[in-house]
Amino acid sequence: MAKNIQAIRGMNDYLPEETAFWQCVEGTLKNVLASYGYSEIRLPIVEQTPLFQRAIGEVTDVVEKEMYTFADRNGDSLTLRPEGTAGCVRAGIEHGLLYNQEQRLWYVGPMFRYERPQKGRYRQFHQMGAEVFGQQGPDVDAELILLTARWWRALGIQEHVALELNSIGSLEACARYREALVAFLRQHEDRLDEDCRRRMHTNPMRVLDTKNPDIQVLLNDAPVLTDYLDDDSQAHFSGLCELLDLAGIPYTVNPRLVRGLDYYNRTVFEWVTTRLGSQGTVCGGGRYDGLVEQLGGRATPAVGFAMGLERLVLLVQAVNPDFAAAARVDAYLVAAGDGVQREALRLAEQLRDELSSLRLMTNYGGGSFKKQFGRADKHGARIALVLGESEAAAGQVVVKDLATGNQETLAQSDVAARLASILG
């Protein structure tokens, strides 16, 4: 017997019961994006490797250790995208979408990073992101945060996420702070673990991200990034905080928040949760005013965020498991008896014509009424439509509300109106 071929480690199948929940979550996210005037952009999964090296930074963990990179038959180096912003900027430049224009874009799709698989962190994961080009004020930063806050309310998880903010200032301010931080770390190098020593030499601000509790204590005495901000960045950050206060969005200023990619400047933010263990970041982003020019375009202010859908789905399932009840089947058509299947098919199509949003599943596999009602329950149906030989002959159907147990026999022409009444 041939050996079964398994999915690659860290790259998961999502089965129908799971995808129904995912679709409900994604639909909610897309509706909110549309309400803010954002347009979808669809991007390739594979890009030229230099795109990510230039955008993310060659000494970041993503580029150094996590990218899936390979040579194609022409010898060109290609990479499965590890994130979405770089490709979105590349597309904007290539198609002339950015210069002297304002764009609000969103994307969704699989990303790839070679990491140790664990709950909420996989080698193939799905990310949704939004990017705004052509706006440099703190008001658009606030809009993105307000958009995400509206997501959490729509998903019923607003009490389980918290907003953290910081400003890393201009590139010049970052350089000044980096020098001060490296000087501090060198004084205490004997207290650093191997990973932080490496980061001190390659990307010192990433030391601030350490999860090592001993080094976190050490960093309490480290220079504070906000002390090195330029005046414009301070004004920008103050403006953002004022707008969030006005909107009633609570937040915490986290002076160690820097994000993991080199393209950020000024605003950085994360929505975090305590409900997912070590994978606490649900959504993160910030401003990247220099990236468009860095990738060959004209200087264009930009800000955006990205969110891992696996983590979001886990969080919604943990705190609001009934959220996707609406994704279940509305009605299940139970049909039994000689010659009834043809009539069941006709009735199902009639009901779909009359109620375009109706989620109706028809039993085509035979079986007793008891087995068919079991299938209806398995699919979460609210209503069972029972069509036997006598009902088919009389042009009727039994409508049974599975939540209350009430049932009634109706003419088939009246069923759509009754379904609409029950389902609201």
Swiss-Prot record:
Q: Which domain of life is it from?
A: Bacteria
Task: Please provide the record's keywords in A-Z order.
Answer: Aminoacyl-tRNA synthetase, ATP-binding, Cytoplasm, Ligase, Nucleotide-binding, Protein biosynthesis
GO-annotated molecular function? ATP binding; histidine-tRNA ligase activity
Tell me which Pfam families the record gives: HGTP_anticodon, tRNA-synt_His
Q: Does the keyword Nucleotidyltransferase apply?
A: no
UniProt entry tagged with the keyword Aminoacyl-tRNA synthetase:
yes
Question: Which NCBIfam families does the entry mention?
Answer: hisS
On assembly, the entry states:
Homodimer.
Name recorded for this polypeptide: Histidine--tRNA ligase
Lineage, top ranks: Bacteria, Pseudomonadati, Pseudomonadota, Gammaproteobacteria, Enterobacterales
Q: Which gene encodes it?
A: hisS
